[in-house]
A protein has these predicted regions:
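Short, solvent-exposed loop/turn segments at the edges of extracellular beta-sandwich modules
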Residues: 116-120, 247-255, 367-380
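Structural beta-strand segments of beta-rich domains
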Residues: 40-44, 166-168, 288-292, 408-412
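Strand-loop-strand motifs at the edges of beta-sheets in extracellular beta-sandwich domains
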Residues: 209-234, 325-352
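Extracellular interdomain linker/stem segments of modular secreted and single-pass surface proteins
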Residues: 265-273, 385, 390-398
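Residue-level recognition of secondary-structure-to-loop junctions
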Residues: 92-115, 223, 233-236, 351-357, ...
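Pro/Thr/Ser/Gly-rich low-complexity, intrinsically disordered linker/stalk tracts
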Residues: 388-423
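Extracellular acidic, Ser/Thr/Pro-rich low-complexity tracts
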Residues: 48-52, 171-178, 294-307, 353, ...
Length: 453
């Protein structure tokens, strides 16, 4: 064998090895949590969603950059091996702690990994473009031990079918009850061997939104209020990449941005996504017992097939071993797997005073079908909905007014208040006019625009 042939085979073998090591990432995001009230020490968690292959097994660590001018810090994959979460997807978690030297308006923590999947249609030569995610967050004394939003719905239901709307929702929750908003972003890249700001956070080469690739028009949007990412509807088979941002707001000030970068695979198979129905958004007084039924049904495929379906639910109203969970009592959701249509799930929650807050609880429900493997490789499709639930303080009970003519005054008395929480206030309004009862709307607190002061 000639030296030229040996060199050729070696080159092919080398490139093949590189490709096997460089193609496995589907999506991911970085979560930040302050873990000390005395120092600026934070815990950083990178969650990635990957193919179930050797490249994923070999990704035992990643490089973090913390945005303060320091060098790379290496974080090990925690909790042992990757976790199989279905649909050919593995979940990987990398954790590291870091202490910042001083407060700042914003720090940008980022991770770049040289393993983006090959053949992504809206990124040129995607296999050569590092996977990249970042989270920016503010450090100041007024924020306390703040955490950035946690994304409960994994990037696993990422298969779309030509001609059908695709939906994904991250089911983001916030530990402190801050307001969340959503917007589209662009997929980015970065040098995984340096923390230089000049070489990180760059727009991926020739990136276009997924709906801008095919000649047939379609829309690709995200609902700024509930996080529904909808592609209506994919037109061409292939891999596509996208990214969106979850903004965290407190008292009208933005305090963090979390990026989820993820892949959508469009296929042409004989399957129709199921449909899910949730109750109307609701507002209740603390102490109300909630019991609601969630319904879902599969949709006939082209060949007239109905598949078994499973309903899932995520939210911080359920028991979780993290700071993101609400205080007890927790909500419960029960639903049998792989039901025939219509499928049923039951949500129950005994609300209490400690659940009162300004922002809604966004409870995520998802239905997934389970087609046979011999139909398009068993491609599972989903539908999802967000149910918004707000809990307000209960009304005062037993209110009585005793008129004192001698002093032209009234003595107000009421029963012991049910939700006498720390820093809670009962505000008394008065009005010098004829007495006409005012009936507040179900979720209105106070006496807005009624003439009372």
């Amino acid at each position: 064998m000639s030296l030229r042939k040996i060199a050729h085979y070696f080159l092919v073998f080398f490139l093949g090895c590189f490709a096997s090591q460089a193609t496995h990432l589907k999506g991911g995001e970085i979560t930040v949590k302050r873990i000390s009230d005395k120092t600026l020490t934070y815990e950083f968690t990178l969650t990635t969603y990957t193919e179930n292959n050797r490249a994923n097994q070999d990704q035992g660590d990643v490089n973090f950059c913390f945005g303060d001018g320091t060098a790379i810090f290496k974080a090990k994959r925690c909790c042992g091996s990757p976790v199989d979460i279905g649909n050919g997807t593995m979940k990987n978690i990398y954790k590291i702690e870091y202490t910042y030297p001083a407060p700042a308006l914003f720090y940008r923590v980022s991770v770049a990994i040289p393993n983006r999947n090959d053949g992504v249609r809206n990124i040129t030569r995607s296999v050569e473009v590092p996977f990249y995610v970042e989270t920016t967050f503010s450090i100041n004394s007024g924020l306390g031990q703040n955490s950035t939003p946690l994304l409960l719905n994994p990037a696993v239901d990422l298969t779309a079918v030509i001609g059908q709307p695709f939906i994904h929702n991250p089911s983001a929750v916030d530990a402190e009850g801050d307001s969340l908003a959503y917007r589209l972003s662009v997929s980015k890249s970065g040098d995984y061997e340096t923390c230089s700001s000049a070489s990180r956070g760059l727009v991926a080469p020739n990136f276009r939104q997924p709906n801008e690739v095919a000649t047939v028009p379609s829309s690709f949007t995200i609902n700024s209020l509930n996080g529904d990412l909808i592609w209506n509807a994919p037109q061409e088979v292939g891999l596509y990449n996208c990214a969106f941002i979850i903004e965290e707001w407190r008292n009208g000030v933005k305090i963090s941005e979390t990026v989820r970068d993820m892949q959508i695979e469009v296929k042409d198979v004989d399957n129709k996504a199921p449909k899910i129905t949730v109750p109307p958004d609701v507002c209740v007084q603390a102490g109300t017992f909630l019991s609601e039924t969630i319904l879902a049904s599969d949709v006939l495929s082209k060949s007239g097939r109905l598949d078994p379906i499973t309903i899932y639910s995520f939210g911080n109203v359920y028991a979780m071993d993290t700071v993101y969970a609400v205080k007890q009592p927790y909500a419960t959701f029960s639903s049998s797997p792989k039901q025939t249509s219509p499928a049923v799930g039951v949500f129950k929650w005994q609300t209490a005073c400690q659940h009162i807050r300004k922002e809604t609880y966004d409870i995520f429900f998802k239905v997934e079908d389970n087609p046979p493997v011999n139909v398009g490789g068993g491609v599972k499709l989903v539908d999802s909905k967000i149910w918004k639930l707000r809990i307000i303080a209960p009304t005062v009970k037993g209110l009585k007014a005793t008129i004192k003519s001698s002093t032209a005054s009234a003595l107000l008395t009421w029963n012991s208040y049910a939700c006498a929480l720390p820093n809670a206030k009962i505000i008394i309004f008065r009005k010098q006019a004829a007495c006409n009862p005012v009936v507040n709307k179900i979720c209105q607190t106070g006496m807005i625009l009624t003439g009372f002061t």
